[in-house]
Amino acid sequence: MGVKNLWDILESCKKKLPLHHLQNKKVCVDLSCWLVQMYSANRSPAFAKDKVYLKNLFHRIRALLALNCTLLFVTDGAIPSLKLATYRRRLGSISHAAKESDQPNSHPSISLRRNKGSEFSCMIKEAKRLGMALGIPCLDGLEEAEAQCASLDLESLCDGCFTSDSDAFLFGARTVYRDVFIGEGGYVICYEMEDIEKTLGFGRNSLISLAVLLGSDYSNGVNGFGPETACRLVKSVGDNLILDQILSNGVKATRKCKGKNSGNKVDDMCPKASSCEVGMTQDSDGQFRDVINAYLEPKCHSPDSEAVQRVCGQHPFLRPQLQKICEEYFDWSPEKTDQYILPKIAERELRRFSDLRSASSALGIKPLLSEIPVPCPVLAIVKQRKVHGNECYEVSWRNIEGLQVSVVPGDLVKSACPEKITEFLEKKGEEKKQKRRARPKKSGQAAVKDVDEQLQELLLGIEADSGGILGATASVCQTLTAAYTVAVEDVVDLSSPSPPLRKLSKSQKKMMAEDVNVAGMNMNKMESESSFSTQSSTSDVDNQLIDLSSPLAGGDNGMKGGRRALADISNVGSHSTETDGGGGGGGGVASVGHGTTIDLSSPSPAIGDRSRVHHDDDDVIHERKARDLRMFLDSIRNELY
């Protein structure tokens, strides 16, 4: 508890600081206060059985370790004799408390040893064991833990005290952290003695006098004094004289002036104290002196004692012991324990390295990263990350057993090893350049040449399998390939079937007996029953690109200059030859006249019962090969357009 109403009096001096304020600081912790805070959050049996209070302590410690905040646990020793009444009252022993209040100094020099077997004492032992595994030493105080913390702070052996007892200032503490909240947006509640002196005008002696007047763990206070009255009295006397005034003349309560004396009051105090006097209390039995001495000369370890020197040194992190403790208390696997604590330990090592570089820079020494005798904990930066909107880096670690990579704040990496960031950004820039480097574009003729080579390879394989039937197909493909090199607007579409063939006229049937050059394609012998030879056509033929996906002009006999015909190579071999009217040879030559349309995608209609011979096997083979060819050409067309 401390001094009654003191936290309210000091409210104007309270500061809410970010958790980062504790970075690189050494702080003493009143362990009893921390455990009481965590245990009071939930008093259910399940809470105590699952040791949730100990888990909360673990997570609070790991958050502070990541900031390189060095902690020192301090526990209570024996109960001071002046505090026995308060202690028994807290335990609910009213009768003992009443007797103790009647005779406050009946045993002034005897302290009461604490019950080491109580539930709370067992909680303290568990916390001390957990702290030792995390590298946090513990100092067992002679009496009050807050008095020992204040003594270390007063001697500059630490940067502050964690305690919720307001009487830490009375023992000499300069900086007191009352509460701490971890996590995103974490902060700490801080009180500075310097602020109290400047803002309120209260020094250490003034605060001790407030304890005498208002009451504390050591006394019940003086009747008639409230916070406002006590503060007015202390301010009116001054910090240097207030204790002597209390010891020599006692204290008397006063009230605000009313009536005829109100016009002469100074700072709400009546200059004629006798006229406004409420009560007078003399220190006849030395009660005030005992309380004052308890605060001015507390029983605690001296700064140069062996116990203090032992805990002020460095203590290692004991990973195997921590894994065992967490498995025993929390039922955690070693891997889960490592997942919680190792990233924080690594971050602490990086902060220590950053602090080393900052100290060197302050001395005017700015060595390169490779010249520092202590190796940098960061091996390399893996990638950039964003955590709660803050810039962070995922880094790989050097010499951190059990930890490969973790995420650390970006500002920490910048202060500890900016060279690693430069190295990472340069590497990232090179990777982007390689990705942006475009492949050299091939010229149009080179692209067509590649297409032609692929077509030739495919058609050679097809010709080897199907013989002379696909010779004509190869000629078609060569014609199409040549067409790609000519800048024309016509498009070759092999994906749509040709329209149905019209019925052949007698003149067309007669013309089939002649040898004709069909679309510039030589049709060699396709089957043993029929053969075709190529001759130059006497008619003029237009060298135009042929659209295989749309029907050609009507193939009437009067067609001028007729276009190059498309041959349906799937049925050419099945036409029987017609004998020439003037010839008496054995095997006539079947030929195709001008303007005749021969479909590549569908079987040709019957030219005549006498001239058609079905070869089912050849049709199946050709259809399959033609389909493959169309699919390949379609893929090339999609790539080009």
Swiss-Prot record:
Gene3D superfamilies (UniProt xref): 5' to 3' exonuclease, C-terminal subdomain, 5'-nuclease
Question: Which residues participate in Mg(2+) 1 binding?
Answer: 30, 76, 144, 146
Q: Which GO terms describe its cellular component?
A: nucleus
The recorded induction information for this protein reads: By the DNA-damaging agents methyl methanesulfonate (MMS), H(2)O(2) and UV. Down-regulated by sucrose starvation and the cell cycle inhibitors aphidicolin, hydroxyurea and colchicine.
What processes does the entry annotate via GO biological process terms? Answer: DNA repair; telomere maintenance; UV protection
List the Pfam families hit by this protein, alphabetically.
Chromo_SEND1, XPG_I, XPG_N
Show the segment(s) annotated as XPG-N domain.
2-97
What cofactor does this protein call for? Answer: Mg(2+)
Under the heading CDD domains, the entry gives:
H3TH_XPG-like, PIN_GEN1
Which top EC class is given?
hydrolase
Tissue expression per record: Highly expressed in shoot apical meristem (SAM) and young leaves. Expressed in roots, flag leaf and panicles.
Q: Where in the cell is it found?
A: Nucleus
Q: Give me the ranges of the annotated region I-domain.
A: 132-220, 132-221
Residue ranges, annotated region (N-domain): 1-90
Q: Which residues bind Mg(2+) 2?
A: 165, 167, 217
Tell me, what does this protein do in biology? Answer: Single-stranded DNA endonuclease activity in vitro. May not be active as double-stranded DNA endonuclease. Endonuclease which cleaves flap structures at the junction between single-stranded DNA and double-stranded DNA with a specific cleavage site in the 5' overhang strand exactly one nucleotide 3' of the branch point.
| Homology family | Belongs to the XPG/RAD2 endonuclease family. GEN subfamily.
Name listed for the protein in its UniProt record: Single-strand DNA endonuclease 1
Which gene specifies this protein's sequence?
Answer: SEND1
